[in-house]
């Protein structure tokens, strides 16, 4: 078992008020047969705490483990969201690499052609050489500007994706995320819960 998951399970166990001794003292023969049957979906739903009432990380931890055990299909939606995010970030990274390589190729080509343009045998006027230098500088500025615009666009798209993910967490009734202000920084408990979800989804 992953060490992070093991640590979280240990934390979950320590935060529970039910002990193994209490469980052993229960007289199983006193449980009616009708209650020993497999619980229905309705009963399972009601056995999980109301997410809106959860305000602390230990309570959220218990809720997530119960949700993962009883209704894993809900966390499956988060797994798809995580996969989509990773795929989008990978595409952005590849696109930026292609953009940088394109600019570097143009720069190398200019460096190759520059000795030819400065060859005295070609007898080019000095104003032509100055124009070439100015063109090179302008091209470099254009390339840097294009790269900066790409980075700014990625930042905007990342912020939009972040807000959409917060909305999905709220829609799935994930504790601590039911009423989140997009402009506020996440609390430490929210960050810990996100890390827990990442560990579970990556397991």
Swiss-Prot record:
Any one cellular-component term (Gene Ontology): nucleus
Keyword Hydrolase applies: no
Keyword terms, alphabetized: Cytoplasm, Nucleus
Biased amino acid composition, Polar residues: 124-138
Entries under InterPro entries matching the protein: DUF2458
Keyword Glycoprotein: no
Localization: Cytoplasm; Nucleus
Primary location recorded for the protein, binned into one broad class: cytoplasm
Domain of life assignment: Eukaryota
Region (Disordered): 117-138
Name of the protein described by the UniProt record: Uncharacterized protein C557.02c
């Amino acid at each position: 078992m992953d060490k992070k998951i093991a640590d979280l399970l240990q934390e979950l166990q320590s935060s529970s008020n039910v002990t193994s001794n209490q469980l052993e003292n229960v007289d199983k023969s006193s449980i009616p047969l009708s209650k020993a049957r497999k619980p229905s979906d309705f009963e399972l739903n009601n056995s999980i705490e109301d997410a809106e009432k959860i305000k602390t990380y230990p309570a959220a931890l218990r809720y997530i483990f119960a949700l993962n055990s009883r209704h894993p299909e809900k966390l499956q939606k988060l797994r798809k969201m995580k996969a989509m995010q990773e795929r989008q970030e990978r595409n952005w990274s590849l696109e930026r690499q292609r953009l940088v390589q394109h600019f570097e190729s143009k720069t190398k080509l200019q460096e190759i052609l520059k000795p030819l343009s400065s060859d005295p045998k070609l007898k080019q006027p000095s104003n032509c050489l100055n124009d070439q230098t100015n063109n090179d500088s302008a091209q470099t500025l254009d390339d840097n500007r294009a790269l900066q615009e790409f980075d700014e666009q990625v930042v905007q798209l990342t912020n939009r994706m972040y807000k959409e993910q917060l909305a999905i967490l709220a829609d799935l009734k994930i504790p601590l995320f039911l009423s989140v202000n997009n402009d506020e920084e996440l609390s430490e408990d929210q960050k810990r819960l996100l890390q827990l979800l990442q560990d579970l989804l990556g397991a």
